Amino acid sequence: MAMSNMTYNNVFDHAYEMLKENIRYDDIRDTDDLHDAIHMAADNAVPHYYADIFSVMASEGIDLEFEDSGLMPDTKDVIRILQARIYEQLTIDLWEDAEDLLNEYLEEVEEYEEDEE
């Protein structure tokens, strides 16, 4: 039986790359438009398999406690609670990097537009 080696950093890296792609694909040019892209990336990166969920929660980079207790789902299903916690941490961490990713994209767009002139 193979053990899951998924860490929070693996999940975050995947979400980060998805956010980067979302910014480019949706041609996001304003921080006000980042909300949907961040939540889409976080939602897609949250693991679904029990072993992966427990592995992520056991890894460094994520606390057990919710930052906003209002986000804790009203359920006794431990898996859903852990997934919600991973999702919350991903959105927090992605927001920290989102502006840098957006600025990087805007610089690329500006260079491309200057080259076309």
From Swiss-Prot:
<keyword id="KW-0945">Host-virus interaction</keyword>
<keyword id="KW-0244">Early protein</keyword>
<dbReference type="GO" id="GO:0052170">
    <property type="term" value="P:symbiont-mediated suppression of host innate immune response"/>
</dbReference>
<comment type="subunit">
    <text>Homodimer. Interacts with HsdM (AC P08957), the M subunit of host type I methyltransferase restriction enzyme M.EcoKI; 1 Ocr dimer binds to M.EcoKI. Interacts with HsdR (AC P08956), the R subunit of host type I bifunctional endonuclease and methyltransferase restriction enzyme R.EcoKI; 2 Ocr dimers binds to R.EcoKI. Interacts with host PglX/BrxX (AC P0DUF9); this interaction inhibits the enzymatic activity of PglX/BrxX through high-affinity binding. Forms a 2:2 tetrameric complex with phage T7 OCR.</text>
</comment>
<dbReference type="GO" id="GO:0099018">
    <property type="term" value="P:symbiont-mediated evasion of host restriction-modification system"/>
</dbReference>
<keyword id="KW-0899">Viral immunoevasion</keyword>
<keyword id="KW-1090">Inhibition of host innate immune response by virus</keyword>
<dbReference type="InterPro" id="IPR036207">
    <property type="entry name" value="B-form_Ocr"/>
</dbReference>
<comment type="function">
    <text>Prevents both degradation and modification of T7 DNA by the host restriction-modification complex. Structural mimic of the phosphate backbone of B-form DNA that binds to and completely occupies the DNA-binding sites of all known families of the complex type I DNA restriction enzymes. Thereby, inhibits the restriction endonuclease activity and protects the phage genome as it penetrates into host cytoplasm. Inhibits host transcription by binding to the bacterial RNAP and competing with sigma factors. Inhibits the host exclusion defense system BREX.</text>
</comment>
<dbReference type="Pfam" id="PF08684">
    <property type="entry name" value="ocr"/>
</dbReference>
<protein>
    <recommendedName>
        <fullName>Protein Ocr</fullName>
    </recommendedName>
</protein>
<dbReference type="InterPro" id="IPR014798">
    <property type="entry name" value="Ocr"/>
</dbReference>
<keyword id="KW-1258">Restriction-modification system evasion by virus</keyword>
